[in-house]
């Protein structure tokens, strides 16, 4: 889908291309030094929607020079068997990062699987240790969607120090990490959720408004401060007047774009950057793994000298 040529739209494509270009340079250097980056994608069962994501991840990984391999498991597999497979990948030095594709069958806890991934191979930034590290301003392995959302806000050129930010939605992998990422940049952050008494009152005073709740067109123009930046992270399927399904966000873009100075389109905003962040995280993970390897066994130069 082509997006209108409107300066108010914060388009993710150009940002993603920039990130992937940098990753491609780093990956080429790592390969030349004998450390080729490799991603393993884990899919459980047959889900068409997952296949779309995997194809996109594979294509972008190839573009960045990162090896990508998919491991498929039957929907009948037990949680214990999957965890054992993940532990095997954790122990494989050829594997840089592990991706758990969602959804998984109801009898399996995706949180349990994510916790089974070693933090050094957690390129999605969803291991409890990775999320916890954000509190301590260790930000380079943050959850991909959260990091992508903040990346788009930075595209506005707004000074984040002291910026009044409101985050609508407080999930463990999007809303909460966004809040901590922004606080680390010096922003003043308010988080709204289903128990917040007046989301509109909070939203109207935000210089930057992030929305991730999964409710189509929740945010209307009268809830947005004039001149604000609006980052729409929602992805919802909606039946249009012609009976066809279309993707819309949590923001009523048609009305809000006339109030906000910047707004992310859905699709085409946060989404493209999310995969780019995944690839950038892969190189961060590889760097950490190499540092551990060299601390344990020494660098190639040191080993040769010995």
Curated annotation (Swiss-Prot):
Entry's Gene Ontology molecular function annotations: methenyltetrahydrofolate cyclohydrolase activity; methylenetetrahydrofolate dehydrogenase (NADP+) activity
GO cellular component, as recorded: cytosol
Enzyme Commission number, as recorded: 1.5.1.5, 3.5.4.9
CDD domains in the record: NAD_bind_m-THF_DH_Cyclohyd
Membrane-spanning ranges: none
Function of the molecule: Catalyzes the oxidation of 5,10-methylenetetrahydrofolate to 5,10-methenyltetrahydrofolate and then the hydrolysis of 5,10-methenyltetrahydrofolate to 10-formyltetrahydrofolate.
Protein name per UniProt: Bifunctional protein FolD 2
Organism: Mesorhizobium japonicum (strain LMG 29417 / CECT 9101 / MAFF 303099) (Mesorhizobium loti (strain MAFF 303099))
């Amino acid at each position: 889908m082509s997006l209108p040529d409107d300066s108010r739209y914060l388009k993710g494509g150009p940002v993603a291309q920039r990130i992937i270009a940098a990753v491609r340079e780093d990956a080429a250097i790592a390969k030349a030094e004998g450390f080729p980056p490799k991603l393993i994608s884990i899919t459980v069962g047959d889900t068409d929607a997952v296949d779309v994501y995997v194809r996109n991840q594979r294509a972008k990984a190839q573009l960045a020079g990162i090896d990508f391999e998919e491991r498929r498991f039957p929907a009948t597999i037990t949680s214990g068997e999957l965890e054992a497979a993940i532990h095997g990948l954790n122990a494989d030095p050829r594997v840089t990062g592990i991706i758990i594709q969602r959804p998984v069958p109801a009898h399996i806890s995706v949180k349990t699987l994510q916790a089974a991934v070693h933090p050094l191979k957690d390129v999605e930034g969803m291991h409890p240790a990775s999320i916890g590290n954000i509190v301590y301003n260790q930000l380079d392995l943050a959850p991909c969607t959260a990091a992508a959302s903040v990346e788009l806000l930075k595209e506005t050129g707004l000074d984040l120090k002291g910026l009044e930010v409101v985050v609508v939605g407080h999930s463990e992998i999007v809303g909460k990490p966004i809040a901590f990422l922004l606080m680390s940049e010096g922003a003043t952050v308010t988080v709204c959720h289903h128990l917040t008494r007046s989301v509109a009152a909070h939203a109207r005073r935000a210089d930057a408004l992030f929305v991730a709740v999964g409710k189509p067109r929740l945010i209307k123009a009268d809830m947005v401060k004039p001149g604000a930046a609006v980052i729409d992270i929602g992805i919802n399927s909606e039946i249009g007047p012609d009976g066809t399904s279309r993707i819309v966000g949590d923001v009523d873009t048609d009305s809000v774009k006339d109030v906000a100075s910047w707004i992310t389109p859905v699709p085409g905003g946060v989404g493209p950057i999310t995969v780019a962040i995944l690839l950038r995280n892969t190189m961060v993970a590889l760097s950490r793994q190499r540092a551990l390897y060299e601390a344990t066994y020494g660098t190639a130069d040191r080993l040769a000298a010995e």
